[in-house]
């Protein structure tokens, strides 16, 4: 696999450096989960499935605080949907989940391979969700990684610089509407620095998009230069507050998809009630325009998320989204119970049958309407 060159190249550089190895560490762990989901609105009302993520992690400590480590994990899953015992549909897959090698010191790290890259100040509705698709309702917080090389340098004043090169990630990531041209690498970076009582950052990413799979022949291009700029800041005052924004511009006319503008404003606060009630409020505006910042017919969402620990091993939380354009509310509630190495999740929801939450349209096929899901997770 060509993507393994990222890992092999980094490993060769490290082991040819002549450093004496001080200590080795090998760790195996895994996560096994199973769920049962019932929603009478679906074509297949009853869904059941299982997933196993085995992970191996090797650490090779070197002198002077240097570390070389490798992580490899896989994602094995299967699902079956049932209308009746005689009418079912199923799917499953085995694929790499993470596969990277990293060289790090006290202030620097270089990581190559299949990895998760995410950043930003927003909590749930994230304009800077450029390379992942984390779902806030997912107890496992799973997301596919990207193939690439990431370098980070940390200054003593808590400022840091990120630089990355991605390659071989042709499927849409995050907020992307169009695939990436697989033959052209993507590049970008981020500068994060202290600001007042918090921190702020500026991010940039460049890729070459490929729109040849679109149905409109006039919008089909093999190579479309795309520039993406992001800004985020978070401050701890009486309440925690943040702003996060992203602007994406296509170098060719893609009609209403030529420009994309997304902005999030949010606050959080923990009330001194009982064991502590944490509340998050976010406001999101997203627009697609032929002209930059025209903001014609933007989608506007409000979100409130509350979490309350019922005890040492129980937690109750809910999320409410409100779609102002369609005047629709999405309601999720989740109870979590910890049993040593086992965790039980019970989730219920009441949603519109037309599911329009940004970046959750695929999940909408399952979570549209009213339903309940049970999930059991075993970590070893």
PLM region descriptions:
Residues 342-343, 349-350, 366-380:
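Outer-membrane beta-barrel "beta-signal"
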Residues 61-161, 166, 193, 353:
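Outer membrane beta-barrel
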Residues 54-60, 98-103, 149-153, 189-193, ...:
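Residues on the lipid-exposed face of transmembrane beta-strands in outer-membrane beta-barrel proteins
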Residues 26, 64-70, 107-110, 158-161, ...:
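Repeated loop/turn-to-beta-strand initiation elements of outer-membrane beta-barrel proteins
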Residues 195-197, 234-323:
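Detector for outer-membrane/organellar transmembrane beta-barrel domains
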Residues 34-40, 60, 74-80, 105-107, ...:
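Transmembrane beta-strands of outer-membrane beta-barrel pores
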Residues 46-54, 92-97, 143-147, 183-187, ...:
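Residues that define the transmembrane beta-barrel architecture of outer-membrane proteins
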Residues 23-41, 72, 159:
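Transmembrane beta-strand segments of Gram-negative outer membrane beta-barrel proteins
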């Amino acid at each position: 696999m060509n993507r393994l060159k990222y890992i092999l190249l980094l490993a060769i550089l490290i082991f040819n450096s002549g450093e004496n190895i001080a200590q080795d560490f090998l760790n195996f762990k895994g996560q096994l989960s199973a769920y049962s989901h019932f929603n009478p609105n679906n074509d297949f009302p009853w869904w059941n499935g299982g997933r196993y993520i085995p992970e191996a992690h090797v650490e090779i400590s070197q002198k002077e605080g240097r570390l070389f480590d490798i992580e490899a994990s896989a994602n094995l899953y299967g699902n079956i949907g049932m209308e009746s015992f005689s009418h079912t549909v199923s799917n499953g897959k085995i694929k790499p989940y993470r596969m990277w090698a990293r060289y790090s010191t006290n202030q620097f790290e270089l990581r190559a391979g299949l990895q998760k890259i995410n950043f930003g100040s927003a909590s749930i509705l994230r304009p800077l969700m450029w390379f992942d698709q984390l779902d806030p309702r997912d107890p496992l917080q799973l997301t596919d990684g990207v193939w690439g090389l990431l370098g980070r340098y940390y200054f003593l004043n808590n400022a840091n610089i990120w630089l990355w090169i991605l390659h071989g990630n042709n499927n849409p990531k995050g907020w992307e509407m169009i695939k990436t041209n697989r033959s052209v690498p993507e590049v970008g970076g981020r500068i994060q620095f202290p600001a007042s009582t918090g921190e702020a950052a500026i991010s940039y990413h460049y890729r070459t998009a490929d729109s040849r799979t679109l149905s409109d022949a006039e919008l089909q291009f093999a190579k479309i230069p795309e520039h993406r700029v992001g800004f985020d800041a978070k401050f701890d005052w009486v309440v925690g507050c943040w702003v996060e924004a992203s602007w994406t511009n296509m170098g060719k006319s893609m009609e209403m998809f030529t420009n994309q503008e997304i902005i999030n404003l949010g606050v959080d606060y923990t009330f001194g009630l009982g064991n502590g009630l944490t509340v998050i409020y976010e406001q999101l505006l997203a627009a697609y325009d032929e002209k930059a910042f025209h903001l014609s017919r933007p989608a506007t969402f409000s979100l409130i998320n509350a979490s309350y620990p019922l005890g040492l091993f129980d937690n109750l939380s809910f999320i409410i989204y409100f779609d102002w354009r369609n005047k629709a509310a999405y309601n999720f509630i989740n109870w979590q119970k910890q049993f040593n190495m086992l965790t039980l999740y019970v989730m219920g929801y009441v949603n519109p049958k037309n599911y329009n939450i940004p970046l959750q349209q695929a999940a909408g096929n399952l979570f549209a309407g009213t339903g309940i899901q049970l999930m059991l997770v075993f970590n070893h």
